[in-house]
Amino acid sequence: KVYGRCELAAAMKRLGLDNYRGYSLGNWVCAAKFESNFNTHATNRNTDGSTDYGILQINSRWWCNDGRTPGSRNLCNIPCSALLSSDITASVNCAKKIVSDGNGMNAWVAWRNRCKGTDVHAWIRGCRL
């Protein structure tokens, strides 16, 4: 599923991401835009053999199990396929674990490069939330 900007913002808010660990909703919407272009089915293979999955491009080396990543830790205790669902609950729950891990949203390269230090409120402007 490809989410609309405000549709995604509303879903993320409902699932408790607004100001989770101090990151406003705009940060999460911005991250999703530049990680997956709001597409829940996005997958990208990394040079180390791991794969990033879903709307927030969660990595199989650490966070989920895809059965093909050597030494996978599966810290979110989920199959990576769960991160490709049109229902973003699994992605959000795992993202909460990731952002609590010490590096905050710096764990997402696209957030660090495209969202950090910008006017992220623009990503939810005009949305009925």
Swiss-Prot record:
GO biological process, one term: defense response to Gram-positive bacterium
Catalytic-site annotation from UniProt: E35, D52
PROSITE patterns (alphabetical): GLYCOSYL_HYDROL_F22_1 (PS00128), GLYCOSYL_HYDROL_F22_2 (PS51348)
Alphabetized SUPFAM superfamilies for the sequence: Lysozyme-like
Pfam families for this protein: Lys
InterPro entries: Glyco_hydro_22 (IPR001916), Glyco_hydro_22_CS (IPR019799), Glyco_hydro_22_lys (IPR000974), Lysozyme-like_dom_sf (IPR023346)
Domain called C-type lysozyme: residue spans: 1-129
GO molecular function, one term: lysozyme activity
Matching CDD domains: LYZ_C
Function: Lysozymes have primarily a bacteriolytic function; those in tissues and body fluids are associated with the monocyte-macrophage system and enhance the activity of immunoagents.
Extra information: Lysozyme C is capable of both hydrolysis and transglycosylation; it also shows a slight esterase activity. It acts rapidly on both peptide-substituted and unsubstituted peptidoglycan, and slowly on chitin oligosaccharides.
Name of the protein in its database record: Lysozyme C
Organism ancestry: Eukaryota, Metazoa, Chordata, Craniata, Vertebrata
